């Protein structure tokens, strides 16, 4: 059915190809600095604690701008929002390089991080909303989850290439990956300008005086359709708790593993970050396989969360690089399980017309956890040791277990996995429910005609 639908609508194939191209190029550009960011900030003169103050400022920026940038995408258009993202991200990346050259200090880097967060929030949601709108307008009737799953494979490969390439470029100079990112983003802008147009969505002007009211309306919808529902609230709290540790742990692992290895080879950090991407993809595949035999999503959530807690504690206690490395990969593989399963659960409960708004609100709650976790664990890592911070942060993630347990006790159809036993395909690695289909009328559908963009 999918192949026939695509044959009847070649514009759908062009839209999907454009989505894969833009998502891949954007991720390739962004990932160029992910493996060296902490090393770059340390080399720029920031202390270990100050590095995470700057990173926490980024998390704060995502909380601050998530809803306003979503309003931009839902009014001025997805194309404008995406182009704004690329422009702001390229500029803020160059600002980082300039700040390092003048030894600007933590306050300036924190301001640069907030600007970088603005760039990313213009992107989140706009791309997916553009895809769904365009496919609906072209008459596409295929499964959206397959498109998103393949898109995740494309971005996963792009992350691998970006982090490894960034690590190798960092061997030359730690600023080179940042310059490369800005150059790549110029190419992304050119491609997006040519292929990305608002089809199936009519942009409209939003007077500045109406912006505050629009933001308040979106925030109220996020509370009413998200936070007010107990299972969604519990999942948001669990994500807030886990994000506080994982956002810190991702960047703290770079200097920590190099210290354990007793090496200053920047390329190692890039390869490790690429390994993180691979382990996350492996976690996605665990979902694909386990959902064929597992009847409840909360079973996967509880199992993965327990493994993550143990892995984080081992990572902090060991003094061996070769023990810490697989512990880190086990930790991030758990993210590949928890992320899509949690996402699928949420999508089963959120009305299609409120989906983007609630996802945006969910991102805000997680971002708030990222602010507190990075500042607190960053301070502990500097005062005691990075290993001690990994242990404390890992133990803190155990708090997600009773929250997932409470969700399990509530039951409901959202906890049921439509695996082979139900006569349907299992949940996709991307986390979109298998019943998500353009023009379908089943529970959990994505209604493209109403698709909105989360900031």
Kindly label every feature range from the protein language model.
Residues 181, 189-210, 406-417:
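Helix-loop junctions on the cytosolic side of multi-pass membrane transporters
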Residues 43, 159-181, 255-264, 289-290, ...:
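Transmembrane alpha-helix termini and helix-breaking/packing motifs in multi-pass membrane transporters
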Residues 61-64, 271-292:
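Transmembrane alpha-helices of Major Facilitator/SLC transporters
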Residues 24, 92, 104-123, 323-337:
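Hydrophobic core of transmembrane alpha-helices in multi-pass small-molecule transporters
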Residues 83, 87-103, 306-319:
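C-terminal ends and interior cores of transmembrane alpha-helices
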Residues 6-64, 230-274:
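Helix-loop boundary and gating motifs at the non-cytosolic
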Residues 112-156:
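Cytoplasmic helix-loop-helix junction between adjacent transmembrane helices
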Residues 2-13, 197-236, 425-428, 432-433:
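Juxtamembrane intracellular "pre-TM" segments in multi-pass secondary transporters
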């Amino acid at each position: 059915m999918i192949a026939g639908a695509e044959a009847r609508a070649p514009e759908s194939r062009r839209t999907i190809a454009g989505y894969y191209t833009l998502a891949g190029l954007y991720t390739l550009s962004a990932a160029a600095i992910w493996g060296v960011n902490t090393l770059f900030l340390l080399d720029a003169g920031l202390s270990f604690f100050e590095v995470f103050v700057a990173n926490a400022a980024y998390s704060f920026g995502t909380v601050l701008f998530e809803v306003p940038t979503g309003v931009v995408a839902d009014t001025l258009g997805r194309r404008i929002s995406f182009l704004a993202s690329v422009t702001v991200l390229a500029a803020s990346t160059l600002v980082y390089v300039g700040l390092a050259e003048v030894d600007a200090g933590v306050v300036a880097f924190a301001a640069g991080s907030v600007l970088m967060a603005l760039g990313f929030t213009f992107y989140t949601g706009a791309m997916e909303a553009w895809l769904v709108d365009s496919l609906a307008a072209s008459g596409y009737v295929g499964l959206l989850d397959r498109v998103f799953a393949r898109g995740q494979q494309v971005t996963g490969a792009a992350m691998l290439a970006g982090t490894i390439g960034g690590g190798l470029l960092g061997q030359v100079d730690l600023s080179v990956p940042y310059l490369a990112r800005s150059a790549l983003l110029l190419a992304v802008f050119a491609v997006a300008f040519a292929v990305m147009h608002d089809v199936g969505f009519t942009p409209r002007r939003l007077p500045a005086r109406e912006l505050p009211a629009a933001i308040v309306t979106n925030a109220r919808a996020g509370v009413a359709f998200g936070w007010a529902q107990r299972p969604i609230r519990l999942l948001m709290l669990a994500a807030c708790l886990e994000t506080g540790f994982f956002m810190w742990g991702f960047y703290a692992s770079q200097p920590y593993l190099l210290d354990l290895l007793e090496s200053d080879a920047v390329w190692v950090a890039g390869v490790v970050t690429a390994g993180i991407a691979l382990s996350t993809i492996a976690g996605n595949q665990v979902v694909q396989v386990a959902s064929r035999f597992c009847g409840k999503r909360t079973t996967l959530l509880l199992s993965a969360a327990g493994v993550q807690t143990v892995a984080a504690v081992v990572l902090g206690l060991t003094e061996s690089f070769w023990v810490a490395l697989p512990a880190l990969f086990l930790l991030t593989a758990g993210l590949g399980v928890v992320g899509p399963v949690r996402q699928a659960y949420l999508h089963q409960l959120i009305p299609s017309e409120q989906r983007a708004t609630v996802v945006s609100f969910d991102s805000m709650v997680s971002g708030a956890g990222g602010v507190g976790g990075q500042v607190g664990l960053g301070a502990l890592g500097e005062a005691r040791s990075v290993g001690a911070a990994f242990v404390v942060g890992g133990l803190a993630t155990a708090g997600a277990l009773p929250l997932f347990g409470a969700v399990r006790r509530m039951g409901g159809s959202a906890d049921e996995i439509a695996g082979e036993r139900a006569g349907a395909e299992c949940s996709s690695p991307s986390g979109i429910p298998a019943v998500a289909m353009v023009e379908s009328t089943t529970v959990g559908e994505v209604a493209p005609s109403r698709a909105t963009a989360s900031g």
